[in-house]
């Protein structure tokens, strides 16, 4: 009978369906399974591919109710349906009995992850770290040692579409952090387990937050507390002026009908100037700046008052000097202007042009000088050109009185009474041609 059982075990091909078996009957989930017994660094993985053939887990003599079995090298590989799609998060994933292992049987996480040995500092889990919260408000959860198997299986499985998504295996993405107090949080979403995954230098101090401590955001206007103003020293008056608003002025948050309007800001500016301790120099400059517009306005008002018709004299002084010539309406303010005007009526023209051939006479000397500059000092004109009257000529000499050459240049030493040699009597019209 014994030999017959051994022959049967030699020909036995074991097919394990963990979906039909409970978590206590699964060979990979029994308390007697130890990762140290496996000859490979990664024993049978829950996240392995379609079929899994472990070279050593079924060789253990106590893996199934203490019945010894011998492994055939030519037998069909052990097939199992250990797909994450068949394992629910609350059935096999969250209640794995790996946490019941002895302290000496547990190993550091980098020992199970040979591909991540360079990141030992990030994946090391201290053994003396507390596993649960000590606060009575937070529910108790299992220890963190069960994540050794989860992390080992998670990092060694390929990313395939048929397995459980990352949100179910990642403890930070499975459930929200804040839940109701009566609802029990799953093991993958506990704050204690997440703290074990954090590095030691970034781990936070565990704190318990009850729903009663969470206060809703105030919807009404918020006024600054009175204690914030009592903290400032009273002996320094400048601190009071630097506060953004006075205690009696409130600011509405979220409502357009707040008191912080442009009108209130304008009024607050005056309060700021009154409360601010100005230095004498600064105050004097401010006063001068405010006085300047008033001075300008007073000057403008004075000019407007002077231009008004009421301030003008009632009688305008008439021109005293009138021309006595019948039919002439000339009036002058000065006597000499009237005298010069009377010469035009008397036909007296004592001022005559000295240029030979030009005999024009003028009653006034200024008219004669204008005749010189406008008539004889320009080339190409109808009148004779005189070089002594041209300011641009090298022969310019306004005091010269004498004979001129046909081109208008002066003949020094000659007089106006002398006749010009070999020129005959020439008219002004001939010179112009």
From Swiss-Prot:
Bias (Polar residues) occurs at: 238-264
Induction data: A huge increase in expression is observed between the fourth and fifth day for solid and liquid cultures.
Q: InterPro entries recorded for this chain?
A: Znf_C2H2_sf (IPR036236), Znf_C2H2_type (IPR013087)
Disulphide bridges in this chain?
none
Q: Which UniProt keywords apply?
A: Activator, Conidiation, DNA-binding, Metal-binding, Nucleus, Repeat, Sporulation, Transcription, Transcription regulation, Zinc, Zinc-finger
Task: Identify the stretch(es) annotated as Disordered.
Answer: 23-54, 238-268, 391-423
Gene Ontology cellular-component terms for this entry are: chromatin; nucleus; transcription regulator complex
Q: Name one GO molecular function term.
A: DNA-binding transcription factor activity, RNA polymerase II-specific
UniProt cross-references to Pfam families, sorted A to Z: zf-C2H2
Where does this polypeptide localize?
Nucleus
Gene3D superfamilies linked: Classic Zinc Finger (3.30.160.60)
Q: Where are the zinc fingers (C2H2-type)?
A: 321-345, 351-376
Name the source's superkingdom.
Answer: Eukaryota
Q: Which residues lie in Low complexity bias regions?
A: 30-48
**By what name is this protein known?**
C2H2 type master regulator of conidiophore development brlA
Q: Origin organism of this chain?
A: Penicillium camemberti (strain FM 013)
């Amino acid at each position: 009978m014994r030999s017959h059982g051994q022959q049967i075990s030699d020909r036995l091909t074991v097919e394990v369906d963990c979906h039909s078996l409970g978590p206590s009957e699964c060979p990979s989930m029994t308390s007697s399974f130890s990762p140290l017994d496996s000859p490979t660094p990664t024993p049978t993985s829950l996240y392995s591919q379609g079929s899994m053939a472990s070279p050593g887990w079924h060789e253990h003599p106590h893996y199934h109710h203490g019945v010894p079995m011998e492994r055939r090298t030519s037998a069909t590989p052990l097939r199992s349906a250990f797909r994450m799609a068949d394992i629910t998060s609350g059935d096999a994933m969250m209640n794995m009995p790996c946490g019941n292992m002895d302290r000496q049987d547990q190993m550091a996480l980098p020992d199970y992850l040979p591909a991540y040995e360079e990141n030992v500092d990030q994946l090391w889990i201290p053994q003396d770290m507390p596993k649960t919260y000590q606060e009575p408000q937070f529910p108790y959860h299992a220890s963190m040692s069960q994540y050794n198997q989860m992390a080992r299986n998670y990092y060694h499985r390929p990313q395939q579409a048929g397995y459980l998504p990352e949100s179910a295996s990642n403890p930070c993405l499975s459930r929200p952090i804040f839940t109701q107090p009566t609802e029990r949080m799953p093991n993958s979403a506990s704050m204690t387990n997440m703290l074990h995954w954090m590095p030691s230098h970034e781990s936070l101090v565990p704190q318990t937050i009850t729903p009663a401590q969470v206060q809703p955001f105030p919807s009404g206007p918020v006024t600054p507390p009175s204690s914030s103003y009592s903290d400032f020293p009273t002996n320094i008056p400048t601190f009071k002026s630097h506060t953004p608003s006075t205690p009696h002025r409130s600011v509405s948050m979220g409502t357009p009908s707040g008191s912080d309007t442009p009108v209130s800001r304008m009024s607050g500016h005056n309060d700021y100037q009154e409360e601010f301790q100005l230095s004498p120099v600064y105050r004097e400059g401010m006063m001068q700046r405010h006085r300047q517009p008033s001075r300008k306005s007073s000057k403008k008002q004075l000019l407007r008052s002077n231009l008004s018709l009421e301030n003008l004299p009632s009688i305008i002084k008439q021109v005293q000097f009138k021309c006595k010539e019948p039919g002439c309406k000339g009036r002058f303010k000065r006597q000499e202007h009237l005298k010069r005007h009377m010469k035009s009526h008397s036909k007296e023209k004592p001022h005559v042009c000295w240029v030979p051939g030009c005999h024009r006479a003028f009653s006034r000397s200024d008219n004669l000088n204008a005749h010189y500059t406008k008539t004889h000092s320009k080339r190409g004109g109808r009148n004779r050109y005189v070089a002594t009257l041209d300011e641009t000529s090298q022969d310019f000499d306004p005091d010269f009185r004498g004979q001129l050459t046909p081109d208008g240049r002066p003949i020094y030493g000659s007089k106006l009474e002398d006749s010009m040699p070999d020129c005959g009597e020439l008219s002004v019209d001939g010179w112009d041609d």
